[in-house]
UniProtKB/Swiss-Prot annotation:
This is Sodium channel inhibitor ISTX-I. Adopts a novel structural fold that may be an intermediate scaffold between disulfide-directed hairpin (DDH) and the inhibitor cystine knot motif (ICK). It comes from Ixodes scapularis (Black-legged tick). Expressed in salivary glands. It comes from the Eukaryota. Keywords: Disulfide bond, Ion channel impairing toxin, Neurotoxin, Secreted, Signal, Toxin, Voltage-gated sodium channel impairing toxin. GO terms for molecular function: sodium channel regulator activity; toxin activity. Negative results: shows very weak or no effect on human Nav1.1/SCN1A, Nav1.2/SCN2A, Nav1.3/SCN3A, Nav1.4/SCN4A, hNav1.5/SCN5A, and Nav1.6/SCN8A sodium channels. Does not show obvious effects on potassium and calcium channels. Its main location: secreted.
Length: 88
């Protein structure tokens, strides 16, 4: 009975360890363009960005917002107010 208990516990622990290790991302996985960390320099207002960039809010998956500098697409003399951009 004692050997059976040790074998059962060992099997369960090894199985849990394998699941935990396989769930971790690999070191060489590339960052997706849809991930928040793939954006430009983080900012809190337009003054934090370069001359040709504006501070823009980007919404991810409906409830997560990041604010980063992005190149302006128009001929603005000033950046418009902070604009949310939704990404899925």
């Amino acid at each position: 009975m004692n050997k059976f208990t040790v074998a059962l516990v060992s099997t369960l622990l090894l199985g849990m360890l394998r699941i935990t290790v396989s769930a971790q991302p690999l070191e060489n996985e590339a960052v997706s363009a849809d991930e928040p960390s793939a954006g430009g320099k983080l900012c809190s207002e337009n003054g934090d960005c370069a001359a040709d960039e504006c501070c823009v809010d980007t919404v991810f998956e409906g409830d997560m917002v990041t604010r980063s500098c992005e190149k302006t697409t128009g001929n603005f003399t000033e950046c418009p107010g902070l604009t949310p951009i939704a990404k899925k």
